[in-house]
Swiss-Prot record:
Family: Belongs to the phosphatidylethanolamine-binding protein family.
Protein name per Swiss-Prot or TrEMBL: Phosphatidylethanolamine-binding protein 4
GO cellular component: extracellular exosome
Lineage, uppermost ranks: Eukaryota, Metazoa, Chordata, Craniata, Vertebrata
Glycosylation sites: 169
Species in which this protein is naturally found: Homo sapiens
Length: 227
């Protein structure tokens, strides 16, 4: 291989590494901003990967490279739970607790994705293969509704047959997630995480919420999700 070809190959590999790793200077407008305060308590053991962004868990989708628009059309992310047990089966839930807005969440929870019967060995590798009760719906926060949290939960299924009620299948909004969990005695999640984004047409100068002093304290993950 000639030196010219080697230089071209090296340049291509370097560019690929930069895209895959998503490394950005902390002062760059495209740097991933981490969630703060109580929102970080939600991030426990789960990893969520989108194209170009990498692991977006516990971060804000940056307002650069049209990421906030791209994420509305990307297919489902890769979800990994490194702590999954090979012989177990799991349930994956993705919801938006801030529908139509975090200030007035009248349609909490909006169900974006629900998959059951996921093998632990697959979940550990990021392969979400199972019974899809609600097909993946990409984050699409309404204009002027502020930042939305997109939350992912993994529950241990323990051989239970999981299903949605007919009325739950009619709409994704105003889903009574707590009733669903109680109906199947699912208990606390094995892992969880979340990220934030807002409508891509909204002002990029708006900051993701950092303080929630007016919101009540909660005792468990399911209650934290509802705040």
């Amino acid at each position: 291989m000639g030196w010219t070809m080697r230089l071209v190959t090296a340049a291509l590999l370097l560019g690929l590494m930069m895209v895959v790793t998503g490394d950005e200077d902390e002062n760059s407008p495209c740097a991933h901003e981490a969630l703060l305060d109580e929102d970080t308590l939600f991030c426990q053991g789960l990893e969520v990967f989108y194209p170009e962004l990498g692991n977006i868990g516990c971060k804000v989708v940056p307002d650069c490279n049209n990421y906030r628009q791209k994420i509305t059309s990307w297919m489902e992310p890769i979800v990994k739970f490194p702590g999954a047990v090979d012989g177990a089966t799991y349930i994956l839930v993705m919801v938006d607790p801030d529908a139509p807005s975090r200030a007035e969440p009248r349609q909490r929870f909006w169900r974006h994705w629900l998959v059951t019967d996921i093998k632990g060995a697959d979940l550990k590798k990021g392969k979400i293969q199972g019974q899809e009760l609600s097909a993946y719906q990409a984050p699409s926060p309404p204009a002027h509704s502020g930042f939305h949290r997109y939350q992912f939960f993994v529950y241990l299924q323990e051989g239970k047959v999981i299903s949605l009620l007919p009325k739950e299948n009619k709409t994704r909004g105003s889903w009574k997630m707590d009733r669903f969990l109680n109906r199947f005695h699912l208990g606390e999640p094995e892992a969880s995480t979340q990220f934030m984004t807002q409508n891509y047409q909204d002002s990029p100068t708006l900051q993701a919420p950092r303080e929630r002093a007016s919101e009540p304290k909660h005792k468990n993950q399911a209650e934290i999700a509802a705040c």
